[in-house]
C-alpha cells in the first residue's frame, strides 16, 4: 500500500512540474489590482 501511495505522490509531482499553472496567484493579482 505504501508503494502505491509513493507512486501517486511521484505521479502528482510530475504533473505539477509539467503544468506549473497556479490559478490562485493570477486571480488574486487581478482581484487586488
Swiss-Prot record:
| Signal peptide positions on this chain | 1-18
Query: Where is the major localization of this protein?
Result: secreted
Q: Where in the cell is it found?
A: Secreted
Which keywords accompany this UniProt record?
Secreted, Signal
* Tissues and organs where the protein is expressed, per its UniProt entry: Expressed mainly in the testis and prostate.
GO CC annotations? extracellular region
Q: Which family does it belong to?
A: Belongs to the NPY family.
Q: What is this protein called?
A: Putative peptide YY-2
Tell me what organism the protein belongs to.
Homo sapiens (Human)
Source lineage: Eukaryota, Metazoa, Chordata, Craniata, Vertebrata
Question: Which gene does this sequence derive from?
Answer: PYY2
Amino acid at each position: 500500500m505504501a508503494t502505491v501511495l509513493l507512486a501517486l505522490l511521484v505521479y502528482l509531482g510530475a504533473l505539477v512540474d509539467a503544468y506549473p499553472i497556479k490559478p490562485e496567484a493570477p486571480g488574486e493579482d487581478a482581484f487586488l489590482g
